[in-house]
């Protein structure tokens, strides 16, 4: 009987399965005595489509009716984020009777220039262009312009040159008139627009804020 070598059985180990570690999400809770709310404002604007038009989404706390109701019961308020929705009131655009130009949304944290072009709007970082019949949505971080002391040839001056994002505002006499900058709307001009043609837009501004340190239950 011929000699035969038994074949060695090789047992292969199954590779270790690596599980992807899930990252836990942590949500920062509002502190005791604090209250998070969403404030909303709704405005309507009309554009002469033969002219380049701009509209700032800047807002003051007094523009929200809920702010006056809540502010007296807290020490301060912090504005954390904003969402702007542009709702065109026209849903058709053609080359004869209802030609509608495009518009764009972009972040902007200071006063708008008096003269601007639509191409200038589009060159801004994070600018988004939409059809004139299309709903536009963009999120922003609210900011304020704070005054600081500067020194020039004429001596010391106070200028509003410092941008502060997600500002915390002490609730006092002037708190309701602080200007909050978020973004802006730029609307294209059409050289061949029908005479006296207009475009209409509704704008919804949602602002999230936290009222800090409740001091009273009374208005």
Swiss-Prot record:
GO cellular component: host cell; host cell nucleus; T=1 icosahedral viral capsid
Pfam family name, one: Circo_capsid
Transmembrane segments: none
GO molecular function terms attached to this record: DNA binding
Residue ranges, annotated region (Nuclear localization signals): 5-29
InterPro entries: Circovirus_capsid
Keywords recorded for this protein, A-Z: Capsid protein, DNA-binding, Host nucleus, Host-virus interaction, T=1 icosahedral capsid protein, Viral attachment to host cell, Viral penetration into host cytoplasm, Viral penetration into host nucleus, Virion, Virus endocytosis by host, Virus entry into host cell
UniProt key word DNA-binding: yes
Primary localization class, coarse: host cell
Keyword DNA-binding assigned: yes
GO biological process: endocytosis involved in viral entry into host cell; viral capsid assembly; viral penetration into host nucleus; virion attachment to host cell
Compartments where located: Host nucleus; Virion
Assembly: Homomultimer. Assembles in the nucleus, presumably in an immature form, then migrates to the cytoplasm once assembled as mature virion. Interacts with Rep; this interaction relocates Rep into the nucleus.
Similarity comment: family membership: Belongs to the circoviridae capsid protein family.
Entry function: Self-assembles to form the virion icosahedral capsid with a T=1 symmetry. This very small capsid (17-22 nm in diameter) allows the virus to be very stable in the environment and resistant to some disinfectants, including detergents. Essential for the initial attachment to heparan sulfate moieties and chondroitin sulfate B of the host cell surface proteoglycans. After attachment, the virus is endocytosed and traffics to the nucleus. The capsid protein binds and transports the viral genome and Rep across the nuclear envelope.
Full protein name: Capsid protein
């Amino acid at each position: 009987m011929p000699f035969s070598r038994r074949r060695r059985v090789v047992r292969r180990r199954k590779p270790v399965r690596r599980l992807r570690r899930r990252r836990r999400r942590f949500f920062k809770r509002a502190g005791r005595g604090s209250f998070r709310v969403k404030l909303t404002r709704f405005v309507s604007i009309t554009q002469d489509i033969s002219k380049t038009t701009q509209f700032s989404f800047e807002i003051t706390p007094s523009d929200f009716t809920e702010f006056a109701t809540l502010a007296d019961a807290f020490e301060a308020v912090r504005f954390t984020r904003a969402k702007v929705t542009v709702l065109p009131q026209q849903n058709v655009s053609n080359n004869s009777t209802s030609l509608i130009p495009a518009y764009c949304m972009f972040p902007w944290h200071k006063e708008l220039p008096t003269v601007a072009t639509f191409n200038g709007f589009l060159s801004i970082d994070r600018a988004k262009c939409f059809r004139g019949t299309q709903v536009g949505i963009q999120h922003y971080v609210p900011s304020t312009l704070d005054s600081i002391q500067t020194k020039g040839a004429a001596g010391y001056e106070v200028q509003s040159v410092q941008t502060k994002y997600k500002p915390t505002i002490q609730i006092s006499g002037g708190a309701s008139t602080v200007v909050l900058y978020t973004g802006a709307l730029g609307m294209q001009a059409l050289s061949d627009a029908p005479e006296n043609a207009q475009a209409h837009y509704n704008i919804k501004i949602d602002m999230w804020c936290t009222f800090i340190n409740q001091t009273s239950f009374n208005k």
